[in-house]
Amino acid sequence: MNCRLDGMRQTWSCAAFGLACVLGFPAWADSEPQEWIARMEHALDNLNYEGTLVQMHGDEASVMHVVHRVDGSDSAERITAMDEIGREIIRRGDEVTCIFPDQRTVVVGRRSAGANGASPLRQQFPDDIRFNDKYYRFAIASGGRLVGRLTWMITVKPMDQYRYGYRLWLDRSTAMPLKVQISAEDDSVVEQLLFSEISLPEQIPAAALTASVSTDGFTWRHSDTPASPATTDSASAVQPGWRAASLPPGFRLRTVRSRQVEGGDAPMEHLVYSDGIASVSVFVEAGVTASEQGEGVSRMGAANAYTAMNRGYLVTAVGEVPVRTTEMIARSLQAAEAVPVARDLRP
């Protein structure tokens, strides 16, 4: 269950150093940018960390307290909004608990197919990052010092207008991302996440994952449990009812699943398209009219959604990509039998 998306559905993310410093850099300085990104992914999933994360888009900013705990092969995290409402997400394994103090409600469910951690920082990239030099260029440079830590800055530059660019400031010792910028075609920053303070302790007590507010008297709801996803790594396992007939270069169908929506007569189909770095989720839902949920573009930070009606079905494509990408995918969706499998399955 992705609480960011589910929350929306309920009406509710020293610049240069001298040669003497360079001589003191670890051997990782010679690594390729792609290797650093792979280390970053490992750090986010396997390190203990706690800190204050600031998410900014436009003139808006949200601040949250993030705790990530690893115990053997198990991981858990707690994300608490540092505002007057104090909404909270607690993930233990695949179980996600969303606490809404303002609504006196707790929603318990499972992580959506392809979803990573609950933190907006972890959700920037797919679970299995794949690199393709046809669509991105990668570079590494000194990133200076952030929150007292020396960093490398990794630049991921898109080669066309269908995807965003990224700048990643990674801790040189651990590859932990301390700052992330998502940039548009004109290089303007559409979203930024950064730690204003962070610690990486050897251990974090289990009590740190306890809800910060009492849920006594709250209404508890258990959301629908997603079916096990089918992935396009096994073509014979993929039987989607819908497919995109036109895709931006490099995007392929990665995941397909369906789930029963509360109050709905038919299951909602969920398709995930990705180029290995950027991802677009497509939701196809029956029984919803255009008047209930307007067609067109909606935005939240770097995320762009495009909604269209298709033969009585509501189609919504959403992802941290330019609008033209979500619009292309949403508008080209067709019944699966009308679209050749080879168009969107990875070779």
Tell what function each PLM region has.
Residues 194, 202-233:
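Pro/Ala/Gly-rich low-complexity, hydrophilic intrinsically disordered segments
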Residues 2-15:
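Bacterial N-terminal signal peptides that target proteins for export
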Residues 183-192, 196, 294-318:
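A short, surface-exposed interaction/processing loop segment used at functional sites
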Residues 174-176, 187-206, 316-347:
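Surface-exposed amphipathic alpha-helical segments
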Residues 30-104, 134-172, 176-183:
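N-terminal mature ectodomain segment of secretory-pathway/periplasmic proteins
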Residues 24-26:
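N-terminal signal peptide c-region/cleavage motif recognized by signal peptidases
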Residues 100-123:
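Acidic/charged, solvent-exposed loop-and-adjacent secondary-structure segments enriched in E/D, K/R, S/T
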Residues 219-311, 323-328:
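Short, solvent-exposed recognition patches
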